[in-house]
Every structure is written in C-alpha cells, then in structure tokens.
C-alpha cells in the first residue's frame, strides 16, 4: 500500500510504501511501517481526491502536465 503523509511540523509531504499498518485504538493512532523499518504515527486521516493532489502539485511547480497531449472526446 502507498501513503502520502504531511509532516505536522513543517508540512513536508512524505510518500512511502507501507509494509504494515497497525491501528492503536487506545491512542487513536495509525502506525505505518515501511520496508526500511521506519515507523510513522498518523493522528489524522484526511480523505482527498486525486484531482486536488494533482492541482496542488502543479500549482507548486512539482509537476508539469503541459507535456501531455490531450483532445476532447465528442
């Protein structure tokens, strides 16, 4: 499973491949473990859609979608 996280302190985006996800109901946190045995504690899950993520990446200059040709179907 892949996850896109945002660092709580500096808002840096972190993309990672999750090896294991464990939910702790006592602390109300989700712990994501990677293949390099790094653990990320997730305290809030926000449901997003691909359009908003793509728009944000383009606006910040991380992605250039002008390289792809497109045409409208009739």
Enumerate the language-model features and the residues they cover.
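Acidic, low-complexity, intrinsically disordered interaction modules
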Residues: 15, 20-56, 60
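A short beta-strand micro-motif
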Residues: 2-8
């Amino acid at each position: 499973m892949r996850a896109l996280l945002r660092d709580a302190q500096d808002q840096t985006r972190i993309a990672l491949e999750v090896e294991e996800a464990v939910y702790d109901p006592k602390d109300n946190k989700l712990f994501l473990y990677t293949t390099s045995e790094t653990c990320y504690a997730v305290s809030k899950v926000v449901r997003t859609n691909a359009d908003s993520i793509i728009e944000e990446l383009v606006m910040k200059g991380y992605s250039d979608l002008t390289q792809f040709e497109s045409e409208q179907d009739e």
